[in-house]
C-alpha cells in the first residue's frame, strides 16, 4: 500500500458546548478517517509503564495513585489546583507526550495509504501549538446562548460553571483568527453536515 500523500491532517477545536462530538461522529461515518480525542490520548499516555506516568508520580507523589496503581484523575486535579505552580509542570509533561503519540499515529496513518482524514480534537489545540502542525484548523462555532443551553440540558451545568469555563477559553475572535475553516454549528446538524461536505467535495477520495 502506497503512502497517502493526499491525507489531510485536520485540527478540530471550539469552545465548550459547540458540538464538536457531533461533527466528529459525522466525519467518522462518512469519510475514511482516523479521529483522536486529546482527552483520551492524554489518558493513554498516563497509564502505568509510560514515561509520562513515571514523571507525574515523581512530581506529584504516589498519593495520586489509586488502589490499582493508576493515576486518580480527581486526586491529581485537586493537588494541582491546590498549587497552581504544578499546573505548568504537569502540562510540560503531558502535552509533549500527547503530541508525540499523535504524530506517531499520523505517520502510521499516512503510510497505510487508507486514511483520507486524520483528525485531532481538543479545546486547546491552538494554545498548545498544533496550528503549525495541522494542514487545516477547523473551528466549530456556536453562539454562547446555544452553547449554554446545550450544557445545561446535556451536562446539567449551572450558569456560574458555564461562564467560568467559557471565560477560561479563547474568544470567538481568537478562534477564528487561528482557523482555516469555520463550521457554524448553532442550528440544525444537517446544515453543519452540509458545510463539511461542501468543504471536502473538492477531494477526489470523497465517498
Give the label of every model feature segment:
Residues 16:
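The conserved Walker
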Residues 33-46:
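Short beta-strand-centered segment that lines the nucleotide-binding/catalytic pocket of NTP-utilizing
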Residues 102, 132, 153, 157-202, ...:
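Small-molecule kinase domains that catalyze NTP-dependent phosphoryl transfer to phosphate-bearing small molecules
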Residues 103-154:
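ATP-dependent NMP and nucleoside kinases share a basic, alpha-helical "lid"
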Residues 10-12:
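Hydrophobic anchor at the beta1->P-loop junction of P-loop NTPases
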Residues 43-114:
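ATP-dependent small-molecule kinase phosphotransfer cores
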Residues 21:
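Walker A/P-loop
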Amino acid at each position: 500500500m502506497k503512502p497517502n500523500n493526499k491525507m489531510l491532517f485536520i485540527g478540530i477545536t471550539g469552545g465548550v458546548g459547540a458540538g464538536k462530538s457531533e461533527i466528529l461522529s459525522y466525519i467518522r461515518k462518512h469519510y475514511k478517517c482516523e479521529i483522536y480525542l486529546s482527552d483520551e490520548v492524554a489518558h493513554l499516555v498516563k497509564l502505568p509503564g509510560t514515561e509520562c506516568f513515571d514523571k507525574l508520580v515523581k512530581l506529584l507523589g504516589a498519593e495520586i495513585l489509586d488502589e490499582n496503581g493508576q493515576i486518580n484523575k480527581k486526586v491529581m486535579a485537586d493537588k494541582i489546583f491546590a498549587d497552581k505552580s504544578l499546573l505548568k509542570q504537569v502540562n510540560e509533561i503531558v502535552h509533549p507526550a500527547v503530541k508525540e503519540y499523535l504524530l506517531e499515529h499520523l505517520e502510521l496513518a499516512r503510510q497505510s495509504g487508507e486514511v483520507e482524514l486524520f483528525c485531532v480534537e481538543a479545546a486547546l489545540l491552538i494554545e498548545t501549538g498544533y496550528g503549525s502542525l495541522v494542514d487545516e484548523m477547523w473551528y466549530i462555532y456556536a453562539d454562547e446562548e446555544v452553547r449554554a443551553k446545550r450544557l445545561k440540558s446535556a451536562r446539567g451545568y449551572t450558569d456560574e460553571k458555564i461562564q467560568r469555563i467559557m471565560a477560561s477559553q479563547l474568544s470567538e475572535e481568537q478562534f477564528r483568527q487561528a482557523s482555516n475553516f469555520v463550521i457554524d454549528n448553532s442550528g440544525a446538524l444537517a446544515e453543519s453536515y452540509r458545510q463539511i461536505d461542501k468543504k471536502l467535495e473538492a477531494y477526489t477520495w470523497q465517498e
